[in-house]
Amino acid sequence: MTLPHSPGSAGEPQASQTVQVHRLEHRQEEEQKEERQHSLQMGSSVQRRTYRSSEEEQQFSSEDYALAAALALTASSELSWEAKLRRQTTTVELEERGQRRVGFGNDLERMELAFLRTQRLLRQRRDWKALRQRTEEKVREAKELIELCSGRGPWFWIPLRSHAVWEHTTVLLTCTVQGSPPFQVTWYKNDIRIDPRLFPAGKYRITNNYGLLTLEIMRCTVEDSATYTVLVKNAYGQASSFAKVLIRNYLGKDAGFDSEIFKRSMFGPSAEFTSVLKPIFAQEKEPFSLTCLFSDDVLEAEQRIQWYRDGRLLRSSTRRQILYADRQASVKVSCAYKEDEGFYTIRVSSPFGPQEQSAYVFIRDAAAEKPGAPGSPLNVRCLNVHRDCLTLTWVPPSDTRGSTITGYSIEMCQGDSEEWMPCLKAPGGTCRCPIQGLVEGQSYQFRVRAISKAGTSLPSKASEAVVTGDYDAVHKSTEIPYDLGSKITISKNDFEDAVTIPSAPTNVHASEIREAYAVLSWEEPRPRGRAPLTYTLEKSVIGSGTWEAISTETPIKSPRFALLDLEKGKSYVFRVRALNQYGMSDPSEPSEPVALKGKPATLPPPAQVQAFRNTQTSVSLAWEPVDGGSELLGYYIYSREAGASEWQTVNNKPIQDTKFTVPGLRTGKEYDFCIRSVSEAGVGESSAATQPVRVKQALATPSAPYDFALLNCGKNEMVIGWKPPKRRGGGKILGYFMDQHDSVESDWHPVNRQPIPSRVCKVTNLHEGHFYEFRARAVNWAGIGELSAPSSLFECKEWTMPEPGPPYDVRVSEVQATSVMLQWEPPLYIGAGPVTGYHVSFQEKGSEEWKPVTPDATSDTHLRVSDLQPGKQYMFRVQAMNSAGLGQPSVPTDPVLLEDKPDAQEIEVGVDDEGQIYLAFEAPEAPDFPEFQWSKDYQGPPDPQRVEVEDEISKSKVILKEPDLQDLGIYSVVVPDADEDTSASHTLTEEELNKLKKLSHEIRNPVIKLISGWNVEILEQGEVRLWLEVEKLSPAAELHLIFNEKEIFSSPNRKINFDREKGLVEVIIQQLSEDDKGSYTAQLQDGKAKNQITLALVDDEFDKLLRKADAKRRDWKRKQGPYFQEPLTWKVTDDCQVLLSCKVTNTKKESRFQWFFQKKEAPHGQYNPPTGDGSLSIEGFSKENQGVYRAVVSDERGEDDTVLDLTGEALDAVLTELGRIGALSATPLKIQGTEEGIRLFSKVKYYNVDYMKTAWFHKDKRLESGDRVRAGTTLDEIWLHILDPKDSDKGKYTLEITAGKEVRQLSADLSGQAFDDALAEHQRLKALAVIEKNRAKVVRGLPDVATIMEDKTLCLTCVISGDPSPEISWLKNDQPISFFDRYHMEVKGTEVTVTIDKVTSEDSGRYGIFVKNKYGSETGQVTISVFKHGEEPKELKKK
């Protein structure tokens, strides 16, 4: 290949090189400029001993060097020739470097160009000496200018500016003045000179720092509002500047440059978080979301709000949405996977720096398809992707659900098919597996399932899609840029020689050896030719001396192959051959011996696992890292409550750090933790469990006290009070250290050397008329807390006003949605008279108005404030009142948010195991060893003579010693050292106290709990069992059974059993008799517990029991032989038959079964000996079948019978049931045309007139039988006949069948086509009836056969009918008869007679009379047999 090359472009830098050259030039110029400035500055500040050379004419001072530095910066444009020179030199170097890198061009041409450039550089030299002389001249001119300008009056370079600030803040007035010689400075306030010595110490601070004048006014008050002027003057003149300072009352915002208004005006609004991210516990395959609220709208939210997971920036995807709307930012995941677990951080950029919040998201394992199956693997990744193979890795699951993982199954999805097919099972059970046999250029995804004896896990999240290909092709090509943006790509294959047979591959080696496989790698042959290559492998066992080809399903296209069929314990060597379309290469050199490794060992557990308290619901863990190198994938953490045996997984994604905070724990509970290392070999052994740690807030020093107030004041003493720290640090406040400061002094002095346990301190040895301020620090077990801000200045002046001083220590407790409880201490200064009451007022946050809680004053030092609005914040204050009026108000409380806390603790009232009535309160969120302050009726602690208080770790109990009406009232409790309100109250009423006393009596005088009182049962053989059940008793329990005031014991007829384990007492009487009548009392005693249960068996109850026992005994005796297991019963079948059935048991072959009806045997009854079933079926049951039915079974062991009386009510029941089933069997109404009209009918299987009633309706109007409508029934049919139907008969017809309570209705619509069809059928049948009536017919008379003796006269007579009269003809053997001689016919009306005189044998034959008219014809036939004299007729012979 040839490259485009021309003389004009030879050696010229390309576009990308040009950009680099310009950047390098610019950076070099900046560096040179900085070096010059630095050298000049160093010269101005450090005096060095220098020596003048022969060329130097003058030595410069430090001022000269400073001026020269400024002139050098302005003269940089004149030295541009130097930059040009360096730029050209750099260009030459880059060109030469580029030419060496590309490796093209003419060496002679490069040398000529370099020579010409060097000549040009030499010609551009300048005279350095002339340049130095010109610089010195400019320095002298500048010095003269300075001398001319040095003497002048002062003037303000930056004047004063006005300030408007909040009170108690500091104001700093500054200005900059220039002038020479130095000037005098004087400050004025409203034209009055300010002398700091005349004001309190530290009030004013005045400084003059080289022309920068400052006046600092400390802790401004409203009196500091004024016009401040600064006057400066020297010998040449004077100047002044003034500024106004406005002091505003503090409204809760910062002042000056820290104010919110200033920030927004300068930088725009800065949104703050108004909610806190909390840990999320989501489940695999389910959605979850993280939401954060802001105080203001976030401008350009897409750019300013960023979400991170484990430090990686998150972006929206198909499963993940990052949203912002309505001051709410959220990240929503539609389908969670374990890979989504981790630390989520929201970061919002602002002008004051980024704001962040973080929370951990836990992804729990989804429910397995089979119980006990392990959790799914995670982090499935594809590594070493080649043309036909890759390596798959994953992370083992943390939760195996008690069953060891034995292996992993891999599934594969090819392309966009979305069909997951089993790929293979990972060999060895490690978390790494080679995948082979892939198609080049195809996209693949993989997922993994864990396998254990309990089953297979759910699939992991699918890996990222990868496309197979030759990823080494990038390293085989070189890109050469030219012109502007163009480039040429040269592939190494382009330089391959035109060889046919490739050479042998080289460097055959095992790149990876595992327990179950080894990966063989090699380098392509050189030369290889341009034809595509494939490879074949051969193996040889060390010592065998033979080579065996390794068969593969597909050709090997990549220089890498995984060997999965190697045997453990053997060493192999391998060699490779290359193939192309021309042939096969020689084998490569054998590899080094390869043998499979043993099973990889898991990493050891981390050491020194320590658990520390963190918050009320979390614990911090820390441990030493495991030296696992790249094999370490992270750590799994497990937890359990102290005393539990089963460990619970904390995280499902390995943690990379060596510390972690476990959230979501139960406050006050103790937990153990252990950690396991994770690697590709699996999850390692558990570390040693930590010491049990209680979930509590970690100990820390408390925050600062605040809101100092003056409670009383004398001539030289003050009483100061304050509020406790908002954060107690998780421990009890042990006391306070207090400092005081006299405003005329500069130093602070401690008030006390030992901690003050209370929040009221009396400070003595003060100076009357002086102003003092105070500050304090709280102390707990962790140490001394933060120092508070100084209080306001309090004047030490004795109080003499008649009104009382302020109440103090106003406390808010029992906060609910609409009410709070206020308590306070009375004022220390009562004024002119005693305190007569207190005035309580409240203020809603954001309002400036104080409203009274009640119209009248309260005399108590507590008050429940009700009827407040939920969800709002309120502040409260109290004023004492005496005869002189209202006194000073107390310090307002902090804003209190009114809401019902779902997990708020309440006072528990009950009775303990010893029968003591108690009131208990548990505060799991309280600090260690909390103090519980109980009070009764808010008047102070309960009377110790009546109650006893017991405190535990986080629980306190008040025990009533002798409960009485004096103990009624309101019991309240407060935990003062808790950061949040931890309080409750309970009103103990008389009704509740009586219940508790009753329960206490039961506990102190225990009664054996009765589960079931006396029960009476009759056993199978007629024995009577008396039993009762109580709670489980100890082995020492005793039983005394009293019968009619006399203790009884077991006897042959009366057996007594006492099972203490089951609490069962039973008495079994073998044969009950009159001697057993009376009362039975069981007296039980188990330690102190007693009980007595009595059963009375007397009067009718005993007689009834006696009869039942005798009957049971007789029944048992009856069952010793064959007996009826099921008595005789009747049943109506669907065919309306009455079926009598019974069943016998305990029969044998000789047993006899009989049926009887009315004391007569019924032979048609049936009996099936194998099953014992007897049955008697009665068809067409009616009142004739009423009577007594009896079945008897007997053999030599005895006899038993069963009787069924089907008379009276029983008979009515059977017939009613027959009617009901008959009604249900009625078929739908059918319409039929008849000769007389139209007939509607329904078929039934049974009909009984007495027990089934029918009614017909036409158009919902009841029909009655008449001339045209007739209704009737038969045994199997119910019908309605409409005679001579007309159009008015059209409509809906309904048949109502009533059988007892069963009513059934059947309907048919006789209209339209149905009516027309029925009417046509009626007319057809009617016409056929007319024809049939008038047709010629032979009605009667002719016999079938007539026998006559010869010579007798035969007379045949028959009756005919027909209208009109029919024609008559006689036939003999189907031939007409001629009536003459011996044949005569006579017709008399409808009677026709044929006479044959003197019959002969020839007259024998078949005769017939044929009648005919217009409606039809008919033939009557008779056979005539003539026998001779003396012969017997044939008919008689046959007989």
Curated annotation (Swiss-Prot):
Instruction: Tell whether Transcription regulation is among the UniProt keywords.
Output: no
Keywords from the named record: Coiled coil, Cytoplasm, Immunoglobulin domain, Repeat
- Which stretches of sequence are listed as region Disordered? 1-57
Which parts of the sequence belong to the Fibronectin type-III domain? 376-471, 504-599, 605-698, 704-799, 806-901
What region holds the Ig-like C2-type domain?
A: 154-246, 269-362, 1122-1207, 1336-1425
Coiled coil (UniProt feature)? 119-149
Q: Where is the composition biased (Basic and acidic residues)?
A: 22-38
| Compositionally biased intervals (Polar residues) | 39-48
Q: Which cysteines are disulphide-bonded?
A: none
Which Pfam family is an annotated match for this chain, by its short name? fn3
Gene Ontology terms: cellular component? M band
As for subcellular location, the record says: Cytoplasm, Myofibril, Sarcomere, M line
Tissue-specific expression: Mainly expressed in slow muscle, extraocular muscle and embryonic/neonatal skeletal muscle (at protein level). Expression in skeletal muscle is fiber type specific, with the highest levels in type IIA fibers (intermediate speed) and lower levels in type I fibers.
For molecular function, the Gene Ontology terms on record are:
identical protein binding; protein homodimerization activity
Describe its assembly. Homodimer.
Task: Outline what the protein does.
Answer: May link the intermediate filament cytoskeleton to the M-disk of the myofibrils in striated muscle.
What is this protein's record name? Myomesin-3
Question: What species was this sequence derived from?
Answer: Mus musculus (Mouse)
Gene it is expressed from: Myom3
